[in-house]
Swiss-Prot record:
Family statement drawn from the similarity comment of this UniProt entry: Belongs to the metallo-dependent hydrolases superfamily. DHOase family. Class I DHOase subfamily.
Keywords: Hydrolase, Metal-binding, Pyrimidine biosynthesis, Zinc
Cofactor comment: Binds 2 Zn(2+) ions per subunit.
Gene name of the record: pyrC
Gene Ontology MF terms in the entry: allantoinase activity; dihydroorotase activity; zinc ion binding
CDD domains named among the record's database cross-references: DHOase_IIa
GO cellular component: cytoplasm
Name by which UniProt lists this protein: Dihydroorotase
An example Gene Ontology biological process: 'de novo' UMP biosynthetic process
């Protein structure tokens, strides 16, 4: 038994407390206290449902020098995540039931965050032959995606949506037009021209989202079941507007935004620092503000990290050669708690929802509200500020564009089904 005393509760329904939360048998037993072997003082902290990340690259199999299941899932629980969706662009790609099953079994044995693998939409992520969606789902896959690559063949995407629809599986897309994106390393515009760097235009994202929404319309018309499209790492104002219009028209589309697109802009590239090189690229301030509005009005369903670890040597290469990607599992919530809630008054209830019930809805999972009988997959968050220090990361990627930023809202206790998987109590 664990008793968390004098703690505020925050979930998608709102805030309440302070209360005394008794945990046992993997569930919340009482909100009125009780006898417990371990007592945690929650004074000044708040308790939330465990977070779910829809989009993380754990690099296993094939690139364990960058990250592996242990380091990635340990980073996850240190970031307050009890559940995580791993992307399939590994080496080899996760495109068979056997590969999905192997990941699930290894992750379960580690006893950290619960892993929910995404499987490739097409064999080897080559964009040609569809993978066996039903068998992948039986093995544990929760969505289909060729993330890391773009879906260039609209016919293949349509067939994938039609295949996934009766299974209730969402199809997630990395929405960039490869012909427009070309070799861009930062947002296309005056700053890229000034710096002499190849640009990736915002129209590359908007054009691909527009096409994919038309493909979704086609699949919706042709399928007796409901196809579900999920747009990954939205980065532009126009892309957001397209998703907003589609939702208002009743299309079954969901979308996510990342911590880096919500807190950073292309201005960070003035230093030519590859730490800020990410795909899609950091955009302008107008795009960032549009994303924040999308969080509030429901256009964006979830905040997803797109955690993308690389080796230190790779990220120290010059900007043109360094790989795309930012590691963020361990700082995502503190970053947005500080930058959005504390500094801008973004509602805490809504912020927590974007880390919990929002991503759960994308996967078709029920909400986790804090009440008696609820599964005790929880995170205790401390508002006390401390600086970001990537040298203390559990992730193998011990670098960060937010190094030195003073943030509050750090996870100090993470539980999965009542088991403590991370503890950093003072």
């Amino acid at each position: 038994m664990i008793l968390i005393r004098n703690v505020r509760l925050v979930d998608a329904m709102g805030e309440r407390g302070p209360l005394d939360v008794l945990i046992g048998e993997g569930r919340i037993l009482s909100l009125e206290g009780g006898e417990a072997k371990q007592v945690v003082d929650g004074t000044g902290c708040f308790l939330a449902p465990g977070f779910l990340d829809l989009h993380a690259h754990l690099r296993e199999p094939g690139e364990e020098v960058k990250e592996d299941l242990f380091s990635g899932l340990l980073a996850a629980v240190r970031g307050g995540y009890t559940d995580l969706v791993s992307m399939p662009n590994t080496n080899p790609p996760v495109d068979t039931p056997e590969a999905v099953r192997a990941l699930k079994e290894k992750a379960k044995a580690l006893g950290l965050a619960r892993l929910h693998p995404a499987a490739a939409l097409t064999e080897k992520q080559e964009g040609k032959t569809l993978t066996p969606a039903g068998l992948l789902q039986e093995a544990g896959a929760v969505l289909l995606t060729d993330d890391g690559r773009t879906n260039e063949d609209a016919g293949v995407l349509a067939a994938g949506l039609l295949m996934a629809a009766p299974l209730g599986l969402p199809v997630a897309v990395h929405a960039e037009d490869a012909g427009l994106r070309r070799n861009g390393v930062m947002n296309d515009g005056p700053l890229a021209d000034l710096l002499g760097l190849p640009g990736n235009p915002p129209e590359a994202e908007a054009a691909r989202i527009a096409r994919d929404l038309e493909v979704l319309r086609y699949a919706l018309r042709r399928s007796p079941a409901t196809p579900r499209l999920h747009v990954q790492h939205l980065s532009t104002k126009r892309g957001l507007e397209l998703v907003r219009e589609a939702k208002r028209a009743g299309l079954p589309v969901t979308a996510e935004a990342t911590p880096h697109h919500l807190t950073l802009t292309e201005e960070a590239l003035r230093t030519f620092d590859p730490l800020f090189k990410v795909a899609p690229p950091l955009r302008g301030e107008e795009d960032r503000e549009a994303l924040l509005e999308g969080l509030l009005d429901g256009t964006l369903d979830a905040i997803a990290t797109d955690h993308a670890p690389h080796t230190q040597a790779e990220k120290e290469m010059d900007l043109l050669r360094a790989p795309f990607g930012i590691p963020s599992l361990e700082v995502a919530f503190p970053l947005l708690y500080t930058e959005l809630h504390l500094k801008r008054g973004f509602p805490l209830r809504r912020l927590v929802e974007l880390f919990t019930d929002g991503p759960r809805r994308v996967l078709g999972l029920p909400p986790l509200h804090l009440e008696e009988g609820t599964e005790a997959s929880l995170v205790l968050l401390d508002p006390k500020e401390r600086p970001v220090d990537p040298q203390g990361f559990a992730s193998k990627a011990r670098f960060s564009p937010w190094t030195g930023w003073r943030l509050g809202g750090w996870p100090v206790l993470t539980l999965v089904e009542g088991r403590i998987v991370h503890e950093a109590l003072e």
